[in-house]
């Protein structure tokens, strides 16, 4: 018996589709863009089967378009995700994700002795890759952290 199974997630007319998000990261992306407070319809797929990743997360946000700056922030969480802008059910633009050089006022410095915890200054990190791993260096305490440690906060 040959059984063919197909996962179907409803298409959106206009908006953004973020695909190939690593499993367990989709909720963090929702919070990063404050989508969980949006009045627009958001379709969330968690732990979906993926031939490339094993499992993946997927987000479809109707009537919301992610800009280049937001795509750079997304790259910190999901550097290999794909971002498609949809208009009238068609992909009209694909955003390439690139790590930003700097990221400000997005994450809290994990170093509890950092000045950002006691003074009214925005956090600021330099972003770089080392041996394929994304690292963030705090502008103030100059400590270097892995992406996973910083984005968990």
From Swiss-Prot:
GO terms for molecular function: metal ion binding. Involved in allosteric regulation of aspartate carbamoyltransferase. This is Aspartate carbamoyltransferase regulatory chain. Pfam families: PyrI, PyrI_C. The gene is pyrI. It comes from the Bacteria. The keyword Zinc applies. The keyword Metal-binding applies. Keywords: Metal-binding, Pyrimidine biosynthesis, Zinc. NCBIfam families: ATCase_reg (TIGR00240). Contains catalytic and regulatory chains. Its cofactor is Zn(2+). The lineage of its organism: Bacteria, Pseudomonadati, Pseudomonadota, Gammaproteobacteria, Vibrionales. Coiled coil: none annotated. It comes from Vibrio vulnificus (strain CMCP6). GO terms for biological process: 'de novo' pyrimidine nucleobase biosynthetic process; pyrimidine nucleotide biosynthetic process. GO terms for cellular component: aspartate carbamoyltransferase complex. Binds 1 zinc ion per subunit. Belongs to the PyrI family. Zn(2+) binds at residues 109, 114, 138, 141.
């Amino acid at each position: 018996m040959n059984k063919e199974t197909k996962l179907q997630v409803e298409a959106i007319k206009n908006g953004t589709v973020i695909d190939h998000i690593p499993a367990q990261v989709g909720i963090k992306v929702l919070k990063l863009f404050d989508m969980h407070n949006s009045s627009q319809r958001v379709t969330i797929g968690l732990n979906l089967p993926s031939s490339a990743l094993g499992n993946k997360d997927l987000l479809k946000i109707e009537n919301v378009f992610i800009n280049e700056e937001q795509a750079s922030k997304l790259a910190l969480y999901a550097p290999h995700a794909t971002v498609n802008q949809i208009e009238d059910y068609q992909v009209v633009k694909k955003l390439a994700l690139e790590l930003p050089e700097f990221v400000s006022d997005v994450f809290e410095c994990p170093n509890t002795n950092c000045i950002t915890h006691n003074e009214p200054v925005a956090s600021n990190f330099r972003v770089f890759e080392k041996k394929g791993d994304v690292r963030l260096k705090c502008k103030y305490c100059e400590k270097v952290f892995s992406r996973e440690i910083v984005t968990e906060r």
